[in-house]
Amino acid sequence: MQSFELEEMALFLIRDADEAEMWIDRWAVSYPIVQTAEADSRQTISEWQHEIQTAFDHIVSKNIAVVAHGVGVSAFLAWLYQADIMTQKRLTNIILVSPRPEALPEDEIHTFQRVRCPCRTALVIAETNGTPRGWAQEQAECWHARLLQSPHSGKLNGALGGWQWGMKLMQEMLLSQ
C-alpha cells in the first residue's frame, strides 16, 4: 500500500454487544477514520448481515481494515459471505479476535463453513482460558486466516493496555502488503 492509501484507510470495528467497554472502544477514539458496529448473540444471521451492511454503507474510504471481536466475528463473517467481489476488494486486512464457537450457528447454506476471507487475515486467540485452540486452528484454515496467540488470557475482552499488541499486528499486516 502507498502511504496516501494508509492515511485514507478506514478502520471498521465490530464489537460484541455482550461485552463491557474494552480495547476495541479505545481503538474507536484513537484512529482517525472509524466506523463501528455491534453484534448481539441473540440476533439471527440475516440480522447480523443487515447490521454490518448498514454500518459498511457509511464508509467512504476505498481501503478498509476490519477488526471484529467475539460475536462481532460471527456477524462480520456472515456479512462477508454475501458481500460482492467489489465490496470484498475494499478490505485490506482483517483481524478476528476471540470468536465464540457457540455464536456460529449452523444454517441451511452453511455460511460459516463456506465463507473465505479475501485478504490478509489473522485469527487471534488468547494463550490460555479463551477460544479452544484446536477449534480455532480448524476455523483459521477454513476461513483462510493465520492463527495467532495473544500473550493474554481469557476472551481478550479487557483493556489489554490499550491493546498495543493488536495495533502492532495491524500495522505489520498493512506494511507487508
Task: State the predicted function of each range.
Residues 86-102:
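A conserved short beta-strand
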Residues 80-84, 140:
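A conserved amphipathic alpha-helix that caps or lines the catalytic cleft of carbohydrate-
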Residues 146-177:
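C-terminal catalytic histidine-bearing segment of alpha/beta-hydrolase fold enzymes
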Residues 2-3, 101-151, 158:
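The feature captures the conserved acid-bearing segment of alpha/beta-hydrolase catalytic domains
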Residues 65-68, 94:
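Conserved alpha/beta-hydrolase fold motif
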Residues 67-80:
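Gly/Ala-rich beta-loop-alpha elbow adjacent to hydrolase catalytic centers
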Residues 1-11, 91-93, 168-177:
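Flexible, membrane-associating and regulatory peripheral segments of lipid-active enzymes
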Residues 2-64, 152-154:
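Active-site catalytic motif of lipid deacylating hydrolases and related acyltransferases
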